[in-house]
Structure formats: C-alpha cells, structure tokens
Amino acid sequence: MRHSLPYHILRKRPMKLSTTVILMVSAVLFSVLLVVHLIYFSQISDMTRDGLANKALAVARTLADSPEIRQGLQKKPQESGIQAIAEAVRKRNDLLFIVVTDMQSLRYSHPEAQRIGQPFKGDDILNALNGEENVAINRGFLAQALRVFTPIYDENHKQIGVVAIGLELSRVTQQINDSRWSIIWSVLFGMLVGLIGTCILVKVLKKILFGLEPYEISTLFEQRQAMLQSIKEGVVAVDDRGEVTLINDAAQELLNYRKSQDDEKLSTLSHSWSQVVDVSEVLRDGTPRRDEEITIKDRLLLINTVPVRSNGVIIGAISTFRDKTEVRKLMQRLDGLVNYADALRERSHEFMNKLHVILGLLHLKSYKQLEDYILKTANNYQEEIGSLLGKIKSPVIAGFLISKINRATDLGHTLILNSESQLPDSGSEDQVATLITTLGNLIENALEALGPEPGGEISVTLHYRHGWLHCEVNDDGPGIAPDKIDHIFDKGVSTKGSERGVGLALVKQQVENLGGSIAVESEPGIFTQFFVQIPWDGERSNR
C-alpha cells in the first residue's frame, strides 16, 4: 500500500544560496573569460604573426640594401656569391629560406643549391617585382611558409631584383600556441580567484541573511504578508527616521489611504503620519506609548506604538491601531449580552418567588386564590414579556430591551415598546451592534433627561419594512434647547454639561457607516423624538 507523504517532503526545494551564487558567478566568469580569451588570443595571433613578418622584412630590407647583393645581381647566378651571404644570414636568423631573384624571377640563392638559376615558384612574388613589399602565406619546394618580399634597387633607384624570405608556418603556429597557453593559465587563475571571491561573498551574504536560504526568506515574507493582511487591526511600521516602510490593508482602510504608483517609499503617507502620530519619543527613548486616542480624518482611533530593536539598537517603531468605534461596538455588544443575562437572572428570581407563592397556596389548599394568582401571573407575563418576545425576534435585542425596561422601572419611569413594533432576527452582527449602540444611547439619554423625579415615560417603536429598520425613541422630558438641536450630533455638544457629548456623535457615525440616517425633533418642555433608519437583513436571514 502506498503511503502519501507530506507536501513539504514531496516538494522539491530550490538549490542553496551558496550553490546558486557559485554556479551563476562561475557561469558569468567563464563566459567573460572565454570571450576575453578568444579576443585576446586573436589579437595575440595577429601580433605574433605580424611580429615575425616584420622581423623577416627587416632582414629582407637589410639584404636589399647590401652592396654585395646589388653587385652580385650584375653577374650570373652561379658566379654572384649571393648564395653564401644568404645562407649565412638564413642560418643565423633561423629562417626557412632566403631567395634572391633578378627581375626575371631567376634564383640567385636557395637552401638547395641545385635550384639556383631556376625560376621562383609562386605568383606571390609579382607585387615585389612591381616594386611593392608583400607578405603572403604560400607553399614552395620546402614547406608551407610565411613569405615576405622586398624589392632591390641599384644606386640609380632602378629595381634590379627581389629578396624573398620564408618563415616555416609551423614555427609561427608554435609561437602562437605558446602564447595561447599563457592566456589559458591566466584565464584559469582568474577563474580560481573569482571562485574564492564568490565563496567569501556567499559567507558574507549568509551572515547578512541570518543564515536563511532565499526560499526560506520568501516563505517568511509571504507568511508575514498574509498575517499582516489577515488581522483586522491597522499596522504601520516606520524606520529610525520616521519614514513609513509598511502599511497593511486594514490601516489603509482606516486611514482612507491608497498607495498610488507615484508614491515612492510611501513618502506622502510618511509626512502625514508623522504629523498625526509622534513617534520621535519612541524612537529616541524606546518608551512605548499605549492606548492613545487620536482622531484621524474624523475617526477616533486607539493606538499603541512600540519600538523595534535589533541587537539592542532602536531601528524603528510599529504602531497598531483600531477604530475605537469598533472597540465600543464590541463593548456594547457584550453589554447587550450581559443585559440579556441580567434580565434572565432577574426573571428567574422573580419566577422563583412566584413558585414559592404557588407552593405556599398549595400547602394551604387555597385553590381559588391559587387559580386567581396563576391567571394574573400568566396575564402579566403575556403583557410584558410574551408580547415583547412575539414582536422582537432577536434574542439579544429582546434581552437588551427587557434590561432597559427593568432599569427604567427601577428609576421610577416607564419604558414601553409600541404595540405595532416588529423586528425580525438578523444575520448581521454589525447591524445588531449598531442597533444596541443606538437604542442604548438614546434610552440612557432619555432616562437622564427625565431626572430623578418619577413618572416619566419613554416609548420605543421598531418597524421593519423592505430591508430597512425604522426606529423611534420618544420621551416626555424637558426637550432640547433650539440653539443646540442643530448641533446635537456634533462631538462635544451636550445638554448635560461639559466633557460630555460623545455618545450621539458615535451613534451618528455608526449609523451612517451602515448607510443609515438619524434625525431629531424636540419641543422644549414637552417631548424629544429621535428617528433612526438603518439597513436590516431581516428578510434574507428569515427565509
């Protein structure tokens, strides 16, 4: 039976950094040195060939200027004496041949004496017969040779012959090959030096990269990016100069910032971020700044900034932040659940007391009074709780309203749910949290406005229609002054004194974030009425 292996075992890992760098540098070095070798060898070959040709030409010119050669050309080939002079020079300079001819190409000298007096072999002498020096490669009687030709002139500057000198081509090739080996050894030495330098470079790179391989760095980077983009908190990192080096999607959304292609190194955001969040103290002293409330573009953010250290040195700072309205939304959602639990606890105590009354009446056998008591209790439950649960399908909202009804009763006031109210359950947590925040603020404001004098009345109406929830909260309190009603949703504006006026501003922000609206009407001394409209996924979640 074949057993499957984990993916990380089956996956073929890339080559190590050291292997990759050594192979790449070796390939580059080999390619470069090969090209250099070919070019240099070609130049060396040409230079060697030209050097030997120039040396032969120098010997040929010397012979052409020799008086003995000029005088010998005035005689017959066998009587000229040129053969002895040419052979002496040939042997001294290790040449293949030295041939002196007259203008009819008849030889006056040759390494093989029997060929003296015979015509020169090869048409490469023609240019020299016409008065031009010439260099050619050709085969004569002796071997393939590099041959140079120089014209001979008499005292009247009249051409009287030609000096031809030959260098054995194998000798030329041998000198070129000797030069090639020096080039090859130089190339190999360069390769060795390059490989040693590459090994040193790899060690330095590994130290800089903390011993990690490139694929490991890539994996860590991808994991970091996935982690940063998956968390809901905004994250902004800065370097030791306060320049923003990293910002995740949540931070961009909270700051209403989108990086464009023209923003290099987030310079635009760096400037605005340094004006909002002062990280200089964190970068200077390494002192964390925790739970700061900062307003950025009409958003109240809760920010924590901590230093980033490397080997004990501060190299930057990281700020994490979250919209405080989100935090408050979670707190209010939790508060709604706590209220629901408290309401159930109060009801359980109340029903326990009623069960004790029923048990007592049974022991006393007061059946008529027991019947009346049970009917009264059932009617009260139907009126108070059963009616509310029949209208409000969301257990969280129902528990929240029950707790507020009990709180109003404890304060001596009455909180009633309009008989026409209807609220389907919703699958959206944001909508439930926003409704709890809204009703909680409006009911608490109404209770505070009614004051300690009992007898006040608060009415709540919830009406759902075509995907929208319409809420009304009325109270018969003192109302809102005309000069404040237009600014009642502004931050800091309150009818309760200084250092208040945050709740309604947050309510308005949350409602509008959902795409809803909120309005108010008030008649001083008579009533205050708030109108709220928010989207509600009641139909979808109740199908």
UniProtKB/Swiss-Prot annotation:
Tell me how this protein sits in the membrane: Multi-pass membrane protein
Question: Which regions of this chain are Periplasmic-facing, per the record's topological domains?
Answer: 42-181
One GO-annotated biological process of the protein: regulation of DNA-templated transcription
Q: Could you give one GO CC term from the UniProt record?
A: plasma membrane
Q: Where is the PAS domain?
A: 212-323
Where in the sequence is the signal peptide annotated?
Answer: none
Q: Which residues form a coiled coil?
A: none
InterPro entries named in the record: HATPase_C_sf, His_kinase_dom, PAS, PAS-like_dom_sf, PAS_fold, sCache_3, Sensor-like_sf, Sig_transdc_His_kin-like_C
Q: Which residues carry this modification: Phosphohistidine?
A: 349
- Please verify whether the record's keywords include Glycoprotein: no
**Compartmental location:** Cell inner membrane
Major localization listed first in the record, in broad terms: membrane
Q: Which Gene3D superfamilies does the entry mention? A: 1.10.287.130, Histidine kinase-like ATPase, C-terminal domain, PAS domain
Chain ranges on the Cytoplasmic side, renumbered to this chain = 1-20, 203-543
NCBIfam families referenced in this protein's UniProt entry, alphabetically: PRK11086.1
Q: Could you describe the subunit structure of this protein?
A: Homodimer.
Comment block on domains: The periplasmic domain is involved in C4-dicarboxylate binding and sensing. The structural disorder in the cytoplasmic PAS domain has an important role in signal transduction to the kinase domain and may be the decisive structural feature that characterizes the activated kinase.
- What is the protein's known function? Member of the two-component regulatory system DcuR/DcuS. Involved in the C4-dicarboxylate-stimulated regulation of the genes encoding the anaerobic fumarate respiratory system (frdABCD; nuoAN; dcuB; sdhCDAB; etc.). Weakly regulates the aerobic C4-dicarboxylate transporter dctA. Activates DcuR by phosphorylation.
Question: What is the name of the protein in this document?
Answer: Sensor histidine kinase DcuS
